[in-house]
Amino acid sequence: MVALRSLFLQSVWNYETLQGVGFAWALMPGLRRLHPDPARRADRLLAHLELFNSNPYLSTIAMGVVLRLEHEVARGVAGAERRVSHLVGVLRGTLGALGDELVWAGWRPALGAAAATVALLGGGVWVAGAYWLLYNALTQAVRLRGVTAGYASGAGIARVLQDPFWRRTAAATRLGGAAVGGAALALGIALGHSGGGWRGAGIFLGSVALLGLAARPLGSGGRRLSPALAFLAIVILLSARTQVRAGTAP
């Protein structure tokens, strides 16, 4: 239920707490179990209505950690409340930076470039659908797994996130995306020379611009729009390739 509620993390985004309202709302099912007393539950809910801003997919890791530490709060462990507040502050920055590298600068542009390359090589309309499915398959799996991973790690999550594996993975994804993007660019140029003319070149460059825009960090609203921009770019590329093959581009 917490992972499902995290889908609405940014629904009540505001300039005072950013994602704070959505974060606290997502925690409600867990807080309801841990704190049966309504007054105590309300007190703990208010404690989480503070500034929170992180990657929307990795934020569920923080939710799992918080619920694990809320067990200690419910048992009355000394200093548990202060420890929860401190760890949330650490995690929002750490998960935000890691999410930017893994998702916004890594997985999304790499997958978009790969889909564009397959489209130029002759893939059908299914390429756009495959891009959409693969992007969401990974990101939503991370969202779902994040709650249980965070809960299992508890306060030890800091050591897990400091593992160089995450940075190496992000760097490898960016490098792979750049290589595939270069291949897509070369194929697009070849497509234009094979008969696409100015119209084919214009369509191709417009598609590349959309893919580039989709790969940029555009703020909370833009990030939700970016996968759709990449999807649109892939569809346009498919259309351009079809027109060039049919000889309709002057």
Question: Model-derived features: where do they sit?
Answer:
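Soluble N-terminal domains of membrane-associated systems
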Residues: M1-A80
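Juxtamembrane inter-helical linkers in multi-pass membrane proteins
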Residues: A80-H86, A149-R167
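Transmembrane alpha-helical segments and their cytosolic interface motifs
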Residues: H86-A119, A178-L185
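Helix-coil boundary and interhelical linker segments in multi-pass alpha-helical membrane proteins
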Residues: A116-G129, G188-G197
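Conserved mixed alpha/beta catalytic, RNA-binding, or beta-rich assembly cores of soluble enzyme
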Residues: G124-A158
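Alpha-helical transmembrane segments of helical membrane proteins, especially in multi-pass transport
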Residues: T139, R143-V147, P164-S194
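Interfacial loop-to-transmembrane junctions
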Residues: L210-I234
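Juxtamembrane boundary at the C-terminal end of a transmembrane helix
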Residues: V235-P250
